[in-house]
UniProtKB/Swiss-Prot annotation:
Residues 514-529, 540-557, 600-622, 633-647 have a biased composition (Basic and acidic residues). Belongs to the heat shock protein 70 family. This is Chaperone protein DnaK. The keyword rRNA-binding does not apply. It comes from Pelagibacter ubique (strain HTCC1062). It comes from the Bacteria. Keywords: ATP-binding, Chaperone, Nucleotide-binding, Phosphoprotein, Stress response. The modification Phosphothreonine is found at residue 198.
Amino acid sequence: MSKIIGIDLGTTNSCVSIMEGSQPKVLENAEGARTTPSVVAFTEDGEKLVGQPAKRQAVTNPENTIFAVKRLIGRSFEDPTVKKDIAAAPFKIVNSEKGDAWIEAKGEKYSPSQISAFILQKMKETAEKYLGQEVTKAVITVPAYFNDAQRQATKDAGKIAGLEVLRIINEPTAASLAYGLDKKQNKKIAVYDLGGGTFDVSILELGDGVFEVKSTNGDTFLGGEDFDNTIVDYLIGEFKKDSGIDLRSDKLALQRLKEAAEKAKIELSSAEQTDVNLPFITADKTGPKHINLKMTRAKLEALVEDLISRTLPPCKTALKDAGLTASEIDEIVMVGGMTRMPKVLSEVKNFFGKEPNKSVNPDEVVAMGAAIQAGVLQGDVKDVLLLDVTPLSLGIETLGGVSTKLIEKNTTIPTKKSQVFSTADDNQPAVSIRVLQGEREMASDNKMLGNFELVGIAPAPRGVPQIEVTFDIDANGIVSVSAKDKGTGKEQKIQIQASGGLSDEEIEKMVKDAEANKEEDKKKRESVDVRNQADTLLHSTEKNLKEHGAKVSDADKKAIEDASTDLKEAIKGTDTEEIKKKTETLVQASMKLGEAIYKSQEKKEGSPKEGDKNDEGKKDDNVVDADFEEVKEESKEGKEEDKEKSA
């Protein structure tokens, strides 16, 4: 049975984990790291890079290096948060045919699900290399506050990557699984999860293997990226004051600033001061310009104070929804790389009135929780029951543009709820069902997940027909809605897809593209290996011919030279099979040279001593083959004794 893997698909970094025995194990990628940057790049020569190799070349290729794509997944192009990203991102964010936010690189358009799929493929390959078998099933984490469209888009990404996503699990819930797996006592915990692009807070009750989410809240556009952007804005402002040059339109400079901002932010978690040093950031007619300034922790904290403060209202709401006060929380579990920042830790401590628990690795704990959930689904982990909730209320639009809720936020999932509605006009033949997600009273202020029509309603005065609307949320938090005319029995049912989400055909095409790319990548790798082999052979052959050419006939020498010339020509081209063929020809042609070198070496090492010259060529018919054993000489005397005996 193939192993189910757990994946934390993060904004900044991603991570993959499996269950080994009773414990989750985080796996190292090909570069030897336990986390992989969520970065995808398309290079000049058409190569696709994922992870650290993509991040390394970002400064020289900013327009085709895609990062933080999780902030775009499942969002429309017109979303105000997307507009903010368009202003900050060095790569191009474009409007898809259906109105979604997509990315353009090297003239090709990619959906955020596709870019995410490239990252998931890297996670899949990491697990396959470790396990030595194909992996086809996964549990993938998402921010607790992700809406239905974002969850669907994440599931689509898994499908494109060749994974059957058995469960979408909320990140704070996953973290609580990893934190509480071996803990037996009953506890009320808050999971404070501030990652690269999103913020979540969940309140849970843990006890006897039951992990029950009481409430969840958050902000899907608040994280380390915003902290980095704030530092970048500060650096741009300071540079403009000094030089009068605005760097905002310089994509190369922006990428360097972003890297410097991230580095400064990380360093200031342990140091009180750091230097931001960027030589040759730009130039004008007076010559090159440099950034060289000192940044203190106090300055950083002043810059990002508002961002940290934005995490506290969701904490208040989550506590209120759970019916608890801050003092009733036993532990605050810190998750996400941003929780290493001292100011974040002190704000959380002040809010909850106790020291946060830092016992878990904030970068790995979510993937570990996903692996535990995978273990539960596989039957390897017993006595663990996870009760999660829907983060946002679900309902439909009713007369006057009002949002009527059928399922309230923080309802335990899976769940199903029905309500009967009627027509607004006499003899109304059809009703349009607009499905909404959100907490606002008016439909227009909430997120419309989708709409469908129930037709064929029998003519009747308004208010008479009975239309039963049923909402069904599965364990992944994904919504299905049905409407049934109780009079005629006619029914219409849909699984909600984002209004601009990927169709099954588009997903299928992307799956095929991903497979084709995999084959293409293998071919490219093979081509590189074949060329390297050919280069090595040419180098060693030329060296040997120069040193030992006199040991072979002119005809053999010419055959080697001709084969070398042919191979050099083949390397200039793109035909891998031709290079293989010419390499083999040179190998065959060089054999005589190899034999000559070997014989010459043998002769040199095995030439007889002066005293034995007369015996050369004589054959002793009385010689008998015998087994012998090498004996280490113990002393000179022993050696002499042996000599006498043999005489």
